[in-house]
Amino acid sequence: MEKVREIVREGIRVGNEDPRRIIHAFKVGLALVLVSSFYYYQPFGPFTDYFGINAMWAVMTVVVVFEFSVGATLGKGLNRGVATLVAGGLGIGAHQLARLSGATVEPILLVMLVFVQAALSTFVRFFPWVKTKFDYGILIFILTFALISLSGFRDEEIMDLAESRLSTVVIGGVSCILISIFVCPVWAGQDLHSLLASNFDTLSHFLQDFGDEYFEAREKGDYKVVEKRKKNLERYKSVLDSKSDEEALANYAEWEPPHGQFRFRHPWKQYVAVGALLRQCAYRIDALNSYINSDFQIPVDIKKKLETPLRRMSSESGNSMKEMSISLKQMIKSSSSDIHVSNSQAACKSLSTLLKSGILNDVEPLQMISLMTTVSMLIDIVNLTEKISESVHELASAARFKNKMRPTVLYEKSDSGSIGRAMPIDSHEDHHVVTVLHDVDNDRSNNVDDSRGGSSQDSCHHVAIKIVDDNSNHEKHEDGEIHVHTLSNGHLQ
């Protein structure tokens, strides 16, 4: 009885983990009932009489073809259908060729043909691109060719056999595909997209919490806050094992028709490339995490000497990851992550200046080694974050993400004086110029002497706006820092 309870608890856990699994189970049952109805109801009697025992291939096709996602089902269904068609045609050709060779040579030739096609097809399965997308089709090709050829040796109705075999496979495959697409579809492309965005979010949590965990004493802070932070720091490990899932989902997604915001020939391979860079970052984070949990701990007062730049490097890299996650989830082009990447690189330069000042001259060699290893890892993560940002921009361009930007503002002179009002400008460029027009009359009255060498247009000031997204304006100033001015109701704050 305890074993039954355990199975029930496991079933509840699996269902709660992803409710779509329960729906998928019902979809498979529905497909089997639909195909089986050809045998149990009288109106379909001619169907059973025509196909005979081969009609069972329709049921077998449903069992082996129906997969969790639309892409996987389409891939298997098309593989099975095309392989059955090609193998059936070649099997008929092999049968006819063997018959022309005479009764004595016929069985020998058939055996040789089956051996050659099985050997060659099995060898082709080792090709990487075949293994990835067509492995199941090759297996069905080997099976169907052998069945058609050997059955044809003993059965003169070879054409009927091939036709009924192909027809039943098509019936089963089409049933699976239609139910998979039109009944609560599960799109592999959407799952891949969500997985990649989730991985960005996971790594951002580690980098944002790294400073608090590394520079604060372990016993410091509220217990619940500390425990939550530790859980966030451990979440990155899921990214390390995501390669197989990403590659499988990308493979299935290539079979899927356009759906939602995913157009035809969506750049699924670019998702795999971005995922590979994320795993590289996760491996460096794994090494960085080992120093947090190391038995050999550097005194906090020594860490404090480099706290400001290191905190900024990790937090800005984490913020950049967070922005890229939001960009992917909303499928919009946003350069907000570039701002954080630039700030993290500026923090790297500040760290370099700080190290050159000799601030660590009094640190013990062993402590110096551990501290410098942490610094090196963070610098590597900052550089890798820049590569990831570039890769995401390539993905956004290839996938035609929406250029969702807030209206750029143009300040014009108003009737009340020098205070301007916001005017929207239609533009799709990434860089804009805002012209701020002051009250020329007031300027002249206050600066009579300055008006000799210039015209009224000299009082206009141009501010180069680098980014305008849905939450903020980003402005590049002469001090090298990038400042953010939020927008509210179309006005600058």
Curated annotation (Swiss-Prot):
Cellular component per GO, a single term: plasma membrane
Chief location category: membrane
Annotated family: Belongs to the aromatic acid exporter (TC 2.A.85) family.
Region (Disordered): 441-460
Tissue and organ distribution: Expressed in roots, but not in shoots. Detected in the root apex in absence of aluminum stress and in root apices, the stele and endodermis of the elongating zone of primary and lateral roots after aluminum stress. Not expressed in cortical and epidermal cells.
One MF annotation (Gene Ontology) recorded for this entry: malate transmembrane transporter activity
Post-translational modification (record): Phosphorylated. A reversible phosphorylation is required for activation.
Residues found modified as Phosphothreonine: T385
InterPro entries: ALMT
Gene Ontology biological process terms from the UniProt entry: malate transmembrane transport; monoatomic ion transmembrane transport; response to aluminum ion
Keyword Transmembrane found: yes
Positions bearing Phosphoserine: S320, S327
Extra information: Essential factor for aluminum (Al) tolerance but does not represent the major Al tolerance QTL also found on chromosome 1. Acts in parallel but independently of MATE, an aluminum-activated root citrate transporter. A reversible phosphorylation acting both at the transcriptional and post-transcriptional levels is required to activate malate release in response to aluminum.
Alphabetized UniProt keyword annotations: Cell membrane, Ion channel, Ion transport, Membrane, Phosphoprotein, Transmembrane, Transmembrane helix, Transport
Record carries keyword Transmembrane: yes
Effect of deleting the gene: No visible phenotype when grown under normal conditions. Lack of aluminum-activated malate release and shorter roots when submitted to aluminum stress.
Ranges of biased composition (kind: Basic and acidic residues): 441-452
Function comment: Malate transporter critical for aluminum tolerance. The STOP1 transcription factor is required for ALMT1 expression.
Activity regulation as described: Activated by external aluminum.
UniProt induction comment: Up-regulated by aluminum. Small induction by erbium (Er) and low pH stress, but no induction by cadmium, copper, lanthanum or sodium.
Location(s), subcellular: Cell membrane
Species of provenance: Arabidopsis thaliana
Protein name per UniProt: Aluminum-activated malate transporter 1
Transmembrane segments: 28-48, 51-71, 104-124, 133-153, 169-189
Membrane topology: Multi-pass membrane protein
